């Protein structure tokens, strides 16, 4: 969070904020919209009691008086006058909205950093730390989860609300020869994100191991942020193409066909890479001129090489009673092949939306003593 203070020069009607030593001049319209009086803002919900869209676009500050570093009194040309606290406008200077910044990682990430015992999450302080860790690294591994069917739903509700899809409220991952998805067969699955053909894409996936009697079937996780950073060093134009040009993703089943178009690299509101939509089994090259198609494909191919590079891959065996939760936009997942004749390998999975852990984190941040 920035170090903030008000500054109003004597005799001036200009309101400035000093943010980490930088002077930011506040627009009269921006400031007027953020009035804090109880007749304009509901204190409980923090929802406005007036329509800011109806404000005069040419509104001006008639006078501004600095009470101290944290408070100013401002009079506007529409007749409104009120006090402004620096605390009230501070969130607008935090482009991460109070959330921890992502920490990009590679294969040298210590799995212990993202591992928590599920029963320990009964403590709000531990739950807060677990969610903070998830938001930083994009993944969690939970141990001591009851190895019973549908336990995953209870875990999911700890972090958010279950997202129902055409696969149901949850789905079983085991070998099925005639399945509608390769995930249900014992073949190797390269790094990918789930459901890029869906709108919106399920933001978070949970996979819970009930039984794993095979010697194969190792789980893999890859942080797309590290791979994109490397690609940007090698081919900045390629990153630009992958983040600006939409590709078609398509899923076909007996009773449903889903098609969505979106860029392979997703950017956040600041224009920074936030993740990917990546599934070579499901995407199609966009219709472009030949030169752009070749440049796009080279970037796509190189990104795939980085995703499959062991230097970027976290590789582990998910045991019965363990659950991994990961940001389906940021962290790609995969699996080594396994022999179903060795024994049973049974996982259950489900999805929740991205805003679940974020909302819980911000709520806990207000109440948990740090």
Which residue stretches match the model-derived regions?
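Active-site environment of non-heme Fe oxygenases that use a 2-His-1-carboxylate facial triad
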Residues: 102-129, 133-139, 144-370
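Motif-centric detector for short Cys/His coordination patterns
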Residues: 1-123
């Amino acid at each position: 969070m920035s170090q903030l203070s008000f500054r109003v020069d004597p005799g001036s009607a200009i309101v400035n904020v000093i943010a980490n030593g930088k002077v930011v001049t506040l627009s009269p319209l921006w400031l007027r919209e953020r009035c804090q009086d109880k007749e304009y803002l509901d204190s409980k919900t923090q929802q406005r009691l007036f329509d800011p869209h109806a404000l005069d676009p040419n509104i001006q500050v008639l006078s501004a008086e600095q009470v101290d570093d944290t408070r100013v009194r401002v009079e506007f040309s529409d007749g409104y006058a009120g006090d402004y606290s620096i605390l009230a406008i501070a969130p607008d200077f935090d482009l991460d909205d109070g959330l921890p910044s992502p920490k990009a990682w590679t294969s040298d990430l210590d799995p212990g950093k993202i591992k928590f015992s599920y029963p320990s999450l009964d403590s709000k302080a531990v739950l807060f730390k677990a969610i903070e860790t998830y938001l930083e690294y994009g993944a969690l591994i939970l141990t001591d989860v009851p190895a019973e069917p549908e336990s995953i739903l209870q875990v999911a509700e700890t972090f958010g609300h279950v997202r129902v899809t055409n696969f149901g409220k949850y789905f079983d991952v085991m070998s099925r020869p005639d399945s509608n998805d390769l995930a249900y067969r014992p073949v190797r699955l390269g790094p990918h994100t789930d459901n890029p053909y869906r709108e919106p894409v399920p933001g978070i996936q949970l996979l819970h191991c009930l039984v794993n009697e095979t010697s194969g079937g190792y789980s893999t996780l890859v942080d797309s942020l590290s791979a994109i950073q490397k690609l940007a060093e090698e081919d900045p134009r390629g990153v630009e193409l992958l983040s600006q040009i939409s590709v078609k993703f398509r899923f076909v089943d007996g009773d449903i066909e889903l098609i969505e178009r979106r860029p392979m690299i997703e950017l956040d509101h600041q224009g920074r890479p936030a993740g990917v939509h990546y599934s070579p089994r499901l995407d199609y090259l966009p219709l472009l001129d030949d030169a752009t198609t070749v440049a796009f494909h080279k970037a796509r191919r190189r990104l795939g090489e980085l995703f499959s590079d062991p230097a970027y891959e976290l590789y582990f065996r998910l045991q019965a009673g363990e659950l991994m939760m990961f940001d389906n936009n940021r962290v790609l997942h995969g699996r080594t092949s396994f022999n179903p004749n060795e024994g049973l390998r049974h996982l259950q999975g489900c999805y929740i939306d991205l805003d679940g852990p974020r909302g819980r984190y911000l709520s806990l941040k207000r109440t948990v003593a740090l």
